[in-house]
Amino acid sequence: MDSASCLPKCRQKPIESPPHSVTMVEINLSYEGDLHCSAVHIPSGNILVTDAPVDNNGRGQAFSPTDLVATALASCMATVIGIVARRKDIDLAGMKVNVRKFMSEDQPRRISRLELDLDIPLPAHHPERKLLESAARGCPVHHSLHPDIDVKMNWNWRGGPDQIAG
């Protein structure tokens, strides 16, 4: 049977989402020219722009696509930590995450390492410390990254006189 004779039968099957796909968000992107893109988050209408980085033919006037990957990881970790903290009635106002993105020196061009400094406004001996750290490691973006990307997390628990990096 050739593919042309199969086509009508194949089209009769309904398109189903994979069983592991729980939610869907639509984002519409337009290439604006000169290595700039504009993306619209359909549910909210928020607009995000990107530019190619200076080291890859761009002007670096906005986030690059790989900057957004790094930003997504930092934001996801902070958000998931925040979700866990809210459930436990823990105030994390002032939490900060700084992320540094390193690109590979060989080909293909890709993110090789992401280093995150997580500044948590709680003492190092906080009883939920391990839970919050585990939440960060379990964020969906972290699980979505290629396993060859080296992710380093540096923890700064600064909620008291016993500040330590972990």
Protein language model regions, located:
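Alpha-helical metal-binding/catalytic segments enriched in His/Glu/Asp
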Residues: 76-77
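Extended beta-strand/beta-hairpin segments
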Residues: 6, 18-71, 81-166
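Extreme N-terminal basic, low-complexity initiation segments
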Residues: 2-8
